[in-house]
Amino acid sequence: MILNERQYMITKAQIKKFQSAIENLEKKVPPQDNKNEQLRHQSYLASLNGEIEELSEQVEEYEKLKTQQIEKLECNSLEELPEALIKARIFRGLTQGQLAKLLNVKEQQVQRDEANQYANSSFTKILKVQRALDIEIKEEVIFK
C-alpha cells in the first residue's frame, strides 16, 4: 500500500523500470532449441509482469483515494481498520505531517504508526485518529 507522495513517485518509477526490463528481455529471445532458457525467460517475463500489475493496482488505488473517486471504504473486521485509517487520511487529502499536527504529535510518529499498521497503538490513539479524520466507522458484532 502506498502511504504518501514519495512512495507514490517511487512506485511509478519502479513500474517504468520493470517495463524497460521487459522491453529489453523481449529483444533477447532465447534460441528455440534451448527449452531451459526459454522457460527461464518466460518465467522472468511473467514475474516482471506480475510486479507491474501489483504496483499498478497500488498506484490506481492511491490515485482514486487522492481524487476522492470512492464513496466508502470496506472494513469487514478490526484487522482491516488500520489500513482503512490510512486510506481515510489519503482520501481527506492530508499528509502524514498534517495528520500529526491534528493529533499534536511529531510526523515521525504518524509515519511509524502507519508503517506498522497501528500495531502498537492504543485504542485511545486509534479513536483520536478517527476523530481527526472526521470519519464514522460502523462495525457489527457477530456471534459465532
Model-derived features with residue positions:
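N-terminal flexible/basic segments that precede or flank functional cores
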Residues: 1-78
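Short, amphipathic alpha-helical "recognition" segments used to contact nucleic acids or chromatin
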Residues: 79-91
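Helix-turn-helix DNA-binding elements, focusing on the entry/boundary residues of the two helices
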Residues: 85, 96, 126
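The alpha-helix within a helix-turn-helix
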Residues: 89, 100, 130
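Short alpha-helical DNA-recognition segment
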Residues: 93-113
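Short, solvent-exposed alpha-helical "recognition" segments
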Residues: 116-123
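DNA major-groove recognition helix of helix-turn-helix/homeodomain DNA-binding modules
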Residues: 123-140
